[in-house]
Amino acid sequence: MSSIIHGAGAATTTLSTFNSVDSKKLFVAPSRTNLSVRSQRYIVAGSDASKKSFGSGLRVRHSQKLIPNAVATKEADTSASTGHELLLFEALQEGLEEEMDRDPHVCVMGEDVGHYGGSYKVTKGLADKFGDLRVLDTPICENAFTGMGIGAAMTGLRPVIEGMNMGFLLLAFNQISNNCGMLHYTSGGQFTIPVVIRGPGGVGRQLGAEHSQRLESYFQSIPGIQMVACSTPYNAKGLMKAAIRSENPVILFEHVLLYNLKEKIPDEDYVCNLEEAEMVRPGEHITILTYSRMRYHVMQAAKTLVNKGYDPEVIDIRSLKPFDLHTIGNSVKKTHRVLIVEECMRTGGIGASLTAAINENFHDYLDAPVMCLSSQDVPTPYAGTLEEWTVVQPAQIVTAVEQLCQ
């Protein structure tokens, strides 16, 4: 993978790293070193095989976080190394369990997260191991238990809040926006809100309009919140662990169709950088930016494109807020063409924000307008054939690349 942060004392860069004005830093929490690991050191390893060692209590600075060659080929697939195979939901569970072992302040709350193990079994076995006080079954009231988690974070705990379905978190939007995202700023920096909000979402199981929403478009405008989307067992575990260790509130998006995806992951402790994209396939002709389930639609299309003589570069952006413009920019400067593929709605979606960011920062490097393929602006139908029609299909990706590369 493009970046691994090793060691029990690992830390991730906070959003405040990007702000040079002191007043802006109040929007997000400053980095804080865990007293129990203060004497340890950690290694940041880049895909170019370079390594940097940092002492205890030091923050990963922006220039250090971004590897010198962010669009380099991955040195080795994790499946080729020693490790163990896990399904994606099992990788999430393993990452959560490891962090609960590591830090007694980590707790879990949500509907049926206890002895039932969660609606998709991400919290299976945690209640038996850690007890009902650290794995708390809540009433069916998202606004209440989300607010409870935020309050717990203000007192020093590190709650992981599960929405049984991401669509249900609309009922907690007031807590997520006015409290989770803004309390660090509105309290004058007195409180940090190290909360992880996670749960299943996306299109693909005929769950109907209410259970198939893509809430990343709703949450991206909330100040102070980071958003990441997992797409493999490897980055699911790494992002889960990094989100729990972050001093900022993080929303982790999980796709219902990816829970049973299997991959070999390392036995050693690792976390993924919350603000770094992953180079999935290096190429020369066009940059394709995607995330979550659409990563696999893009890779399916890439096989067809290669047979047609095209060489697409595929990047899983992973960080939906903030964007890794370093990795994206390096790719744009090389290929000069950009296609964005997302499952989010077209109007006000992640693709629209990413298009704006690319045009603002890399307009002079573009040989063609940025193209974005998104889901239809319609409620998700229940019928399977209609459901698939609303999201981007590989054939559409192939056609779009052919148009952009003419």
From Swiss-Prot:
Pfam families: Transket_pyr, Transketolase_C
Cysteines paired by S-S bonds: none
Protein's UniProt keywords contain Protein biosynthesis: no
GO-annotated molecular function: metal ion binding; pyruvate dehydrogenase (acetyl-transferring) activity
Transit peptide location on this chain: 1-44
Record's catalysed reaction(s): N(6)-[(R)-lipoyl]-L-lysyl-[protein] + pyruvate + H(+) = N(6)-[(R)-S(8)-acetyldihydrolipoyl]-L-lysyl-[protein] + CO2
Cofactor: thiamine diphosphate
GO CC terms of this entry: chloroplast; chloroplast envelope; chloroplast stroma; nucleus
CDD domains: TPP_PYR_E1-PDHc-beta_like (cd07036)
Superkingdom in the source lineage: Eukaryota
InterPro entries from the UniProt entry: THDP-binding, Transketo_C/PFOR_II, Transketolase-like_Pyr-bd, Transketolase_C
SMART domains (UniProt xref): Transket_pyr
Binding-site list for K(+): V195, A243, I244, N248
EC number(s) per entry: 1.2.4.1
Residues reported in the UniProt entry to bind thiamine diphosphate: E142
Example GO BP: fatty acid biosynthetic process
Keyword Oxidoreductase attached: yes
Keywords noted in UniProt: Chloroplast, Metal-binding, Oxidoreductase, Plastid, Potassium, Pyruvate, Thiamine pyrophosphate, Transit peptide
Subcellular location as annotated: Plastid, Chloroplast
Function description: The pyruvate dehydrogenase complex catalyzes the overall conversion of pyruvate to acetyl-CoA and CO(2). It contains multiple copies of three enzymatic components: pyruvate dehydrogenase (E1), dihydrolipoamide acetyltransferase (E2) and lipoamide dehydrogenase (E3).
Subunit and interaction comment: Tetramer of 2 alpha and 2 beta subunits.
Name of the protein in question: Pyruvate dehydrogenase E1 component subunit beta-2, chloroplastic
